[in-house]
Swiss-Prot record:
The keyword Lyase does not apply. HAMAP family: PxpA. Belongs to the LamB/PxpA family. GO terms for biological process: carbohydrate metabolic process. Catalyzes the cleavage of 5-oxoproline to form L-glutamate coupled to the hydrolysis of ATP to ADP and inorganic phosphate. It comes from Oceanobacillus iheyensis (strain DSM 14371 / CIP 107618 / JCM 11309 / KCTC 3954 / HTE831). SUPFAM superfamilies: Glycoside hydrolase/deacetylase. It is an enzyme of class 3 (hydrolase). This is 5-oxoprolinase subunit A.
C-alpha cells in the first residue's frame, strides 16, 4: 500500500521586532505552511516575507487565522459569536491571499489557530462559521482541522475538501481531543516516541490515548512545531523516518470545482 502524508507548520508568527520560530529552517522539511494573518501574530512585513519563503521552498501557502489577541498569542478562548468568527476568518484569509496573489501564487488551505482551532473542534456553530467562511471565499480551498473533530465534520458538510490533522508532539484524550497545554502530560518530549506515534497514525490509523486505550485517528496532515528548542532536529528526523518507512511526504491536492 502506498502511504502519503502532508507535513505542516504554523509559521510567520513573529511580530514587528519579535522573532518567533525558525521559519527558514523548518520550511525545508514541510509541504504546507500555515501563515499567521496579523490577529494573533504576524504583520504585513512578515506575511510578505513568509510567502516568499514558501514560494522558494515550493511549500503550499495557507492562512492561519486566529482570535484577535496578540498578547495572548491567540491561545486564550474568547466569548465570540459565530457571526464574528465568520467575519474574522474572511478578513484574515483575505490578507494572506492578497500577498500570494500579488506574487502570482494561490492560497491552498486554511487552518485556524490556537483557541479558535480548539473551539472549532468541539463547538458546532463555531466550526460551521469557519467552514462557511472558507467555502464562501473559495470552495476549492482545503480546510485543516483536528482529526475527527466538528470542524472536519462541518467542512465536509458545506462541501469543502478537508485534511484531518494530527500532532506529532501532543498527547490525546480518550475522546480524540488534544490534552490541554495546561496539563503536565500535554507534550511528548521524546523524539523516538513522537516519531513512532506518527508512523502508527499514518499506517494504522491508531494512536494510544493518555489512559492507555487505542483510539482511531485519520492522519492526512501532521503538524510539526517550529518554535521549540528541538524543533529542527525533530523535523529532520521525522522527515527521514517517514521516508524510511515508505511514506511519501507531499502537499494535499486541491480539488477544483
Amino acid at each position: 500500500m502506498q502511504y502519503q502524508v502532508d507535513l505542516n507548520s504554523d509559521i510567520g508568527e513573529s511580530y514587528g521586532a519579535y522573532t518567533i520560530g525558525q521559519d527558514d529552517e523548518v520550511m525545508e522539511f514541510i509541504t504546507s505552511a500555515n501563515i499567521a494573518c496579523g490577529y494573533h501574530a504576524g504583520d504585513h512585513n512578515i506575511i510578505h516575507r513568509t510567502i516568499d519563503l514558501a514560494i522558494k521552498n515550493n511549500v503550499a501557502i495557507g492562512a492561519h487565522p486566529g482570535l484577535q489577541d496578540l498578547i495572548g498569542f491567540g491561545r486564550r478562548p474568547m466569548q465570540i459569536s459565530p457571526e464574528e468568527v465568520y467575519q474574522l476568518t474572511v478578513y484574515q484569509i483575505g490578507a494572506v491571499q492578497a500577498f500570494a496573489q500579488v506574487k502570482g501564487h494561490n492560497l491552498y488551505h486554511v487552518k485556524p489557530h490556537g483557541a479558535l482551532y480548539n473551539m472549532a473542534a468541539k463547538d458546532t456553530a463555531i466550526a460551521k462559521a469557519i467552514a462557511q467562511a472558507v467555502y464562501d471565499y473559495n470552495p476549492n480551498l482545503i480546510l485543516f482541522g483536528l482529526a475527527n473533530s466538528e470542524l472536519i465534520r462541518m467542512g465536509k458538510e458545506v462541501g469543502l475538501n478537508v485534511a484531518n490533522e494530527v500532532f506529532a508532539d501532543r498527547t490525546y484524550q480518550p475522546d480524540g481531543s488534544l490534552t490541554p497545554r495546561t496539563s503536565p502530560n500535554a507534550m511528548i518530549h521524546d523524539t523516538d516516541e513522537a516519531v513512532e506515534r506518527v508512523i502508527r497514525m499514518v499506517k494504522e490509523n491508531k494512536i494510544e490515548a493518555v489512559d492507555g486505550t487505542d483510539i482511531s485517528i485519520i492522519a492526512d496532515t501532521i503538524c510539526i512545531h517550529g518554535d521549540g528548542p528541538k524543533s529542527l532536529e525533530f523535523s529532520r528526523r521525522l522527515s527521514h523516518e517517514l521516508k524510511n518507512q515508505g511514506i511519501s511526504i507531499q502537499k494535499r491536492e486541491m480539488h477544483h470545482g
